[in-house]
Design a protein with these regions (language model features):
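Short beta-strand boundary microenvironments
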Residues: 110-135
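Acidic/polar N-terminal loop/beta-strand segments that form early-domain functional surfaces
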Residues: 12-14, 49-51, 96-98, 119, ...
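Short, glycine/acidic-enriched capping/hinge loops at junctions between secondary-structure elements
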Residues: 58-61, 105-106, 127-129, 193-196, ...
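Structured soluble/peripheral alpha/beta segments that form catalytic or ligand/cofactor-binding pockets
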Residues: 133-450, 454, 459-507
Length: 507
């Protein structure tokens, strides 16, 4: 049931992902009295800049020359500047590149250094700064349309596509990438974890796929089902989210929903599980993803469906559980890792949905590492907070391989950022554990990926290669289900909500 790599979200020491994006806005500092200065890039009432950029740099044309930019600009545009939440205060917004140093080569081979500017025609006109045309026409093309207003299907493919290991990546044989889904029963008493995994160095011949499905009953038993797929029967793409692992598939439908179909056999038994679900992401409830690292530490994480509903059925030997609009979630993970642990969670909380986490690499043990907390509501992105710590109360006990392990019964974290406050309280209702040391002694879950699918049935895990995940001091990987309650004030308004979610830590 291991599910390692949501941790990618969690390189919070670097202010990963949306944490970085939102900080980059530096909106408070961007309310510049010089905003209409003719020497400034732009020309609107507000110019959004990378954090720390000196306004004088803009006046001298340094923005283009130094290649300043705002990471994940499309997300900033969609979730903040052009969002329904700010529609009453922002009438128009436009991305702009100004004075970028570019080299132009003529048909005759002559090369010239030029300054180039660019933007999206319709948005530039809306803010009153269209580029001057010497000749021709300047109008939106399909790429501009996708940037401004992608369809749900286009958005899924953009943030949920697959990747290749960077050329300088060490330990390429431990590369793994996967789609993960979960679905919760209407009574909140049972749930399923479903993973579609591609593992190994996909640029070589030593890689393959697997499907792992775990069915869990609260305070009851877990059943794990696994299918191995040789690379010849695996299809993935670096331009779209669709994945085929033999007969098991993840397909983005024209309406942007996910069609999820999977089949696997129970470990140590003959029972077969078949999954047929349609997962519908809630509008605007997504985390666009981030990819960081170099050498032996490369990873990425995206959440295309932070809040979603699932309809369909999960059947074991023809005995089916039906779902209609059930609570669901989907994320996408990729990378390589060694010697890390993490805290992670995703939960509904009334009309809100919360995502939190942090990763602790070998160099972070014993050091305080803040959490990253990402909050959305029906209008999309609401806030990013950075609690300094998460406080666990180990009031429960579980048995792992005959040993009693204390695990959390409660967890609390909170943060204050200016006038904004957030407090999150987790009440744990179910927990299971895995001794990663024992897993390391057994068959690697992906060691057989270069062999035929039925050559052997080694140990398999939920979320990729866990063998190097835990440190010796905290070898037990703990997966929890429970209730989350949030409270506080964001943007001058009270927030409050309670809901169900899944959480992870180590002991």
């Amino acid at each position: 049931m291991l599910r390692p790599w949501r941790s990618l979200l969690l390189f919070f020491g670097y202010g990963v992902g949306v944490g970085v994006m939102v900080v980059l806005l530096s909106i408070g500092e961007a309310l510049l009295s010089q905003a209409r200065d003719e020497r400034l890039v732009g020309g609107g009432s507000v110019t959004v800049l990378p954090q720390g950029l000196d306004v004088e740099v803009m006046k001298t044309g340094g923005v283009g020359g130094l290649y300043f930019s705002i990471d994940h600009g499309r997300f900033i545009y969609d979730q903040l500047l052009a969002s329904p939440r700010l529609a009453k205060v922002i009438s128009a917004a436009a991305p702009q590149i100004d004075g970028r140093l570019t080299y132009l080569r003529t048909a005759g081979g002559a090369e010239y250094a030029v300054r180039a500017s660019g933007g999206i025609p319709s948005t530039a006109r809306n803010v009153g700064v269209p580029l001057e045309l010497a000749a021709g026409v300047w109008q939106d093309d399909d790429g501009d349309r996708k940037w401004i207003s992608p369809t749900a299907r286009e958005l899924r493919h953009e943030i949920d596509r697959f990747h290749l290991p960077p050329a300088n990546t060490a330990n390429r044989d431990s590369w793994a990438e996967w789609h993960y889904f979960n679905v919760l029963s209407p009574d909140n008493k049972s749930w399923a974890f479903i993973s579609f995994i591609v593992a190994g160095d996909v640029t070589s011949e030593k890689w393959g796929g697997s499907v792992t499905i775990t069915l869990r009953e609260q305070d009851g038993r877990s059943r794990k089902f696994v299918s191995y797929i040789p690379r010849e029967r695996v299809r993935f793409s670096t331009t779209d989210a669709n994945l085929s692992l033999g007969g098991s598939t993840v397909t983005v439908r024209p309406d942007g929903d996910y069609a999820v179909s999977a089949e696997a056999r129970e470990e140590g038994g003959r029972d077969v599980v078949r999954v047929n679900l349609v997962v519908t992401p809630s509008p605007r409830a997504y985390f666009p993803g981030a990819s960081l690292g170099s050498g032996d530490f490369v990873s990425g994480y995206a959440v295309p469906a932070l809040r979603a509903s699932a309809s369909g059925r999960i059947c074991v030997n023809g005995e089916c559980e039906n779902y209609m609009g059930a609570q669901s979630y989907h994320d996408h993970n990729w990378g390589v890792w060694r010697g890390v642990t993490w805290d992670w969670g995703a939960s509904r909380a009334g009309s809100y949905t919360i995502l939190y986490g942090r990763v602790l690499g070998p160099d972070r043990y014993g050091r305080e590492t803040p959490l990253f907390v990402y909050l959305v509501d029906s209008l999309g992105f609401r806030a990013v907070m950075r609690p300094r710590r998460i406080e666990y109360t180990d009031g429960r006990t579980i048995v792992v391989d005959g040993k009693r392990i204390p695990v959390p019964s409660r967890a609390v974290f909170a943060d204050v950022r200016g006038a904004d406050t957030l407090r999150v309280e987790l009440t744990i209702e179910d927990a299971i554990g895995t001794d990663t040391r024992k897993q390391a002694e057994g068959q690697s879950p992906f060691a057989n990926q270069t062999r035929s699918a039925d050559a052997e049935r080694g140990r398999s895990e939920e979320r990729g290669d866990p063998l190097r995940a835990a440190d010796a001091e905290r070898p037990y990987f703990i997966q929890m289900k429970g209730a989350a309650r949030i409270s506080g004030r964001i943007g001058g308004g009270v927030i409050d909500g309670t809901g169900t979610g899944f959480f992870e830590t180590y002991r």
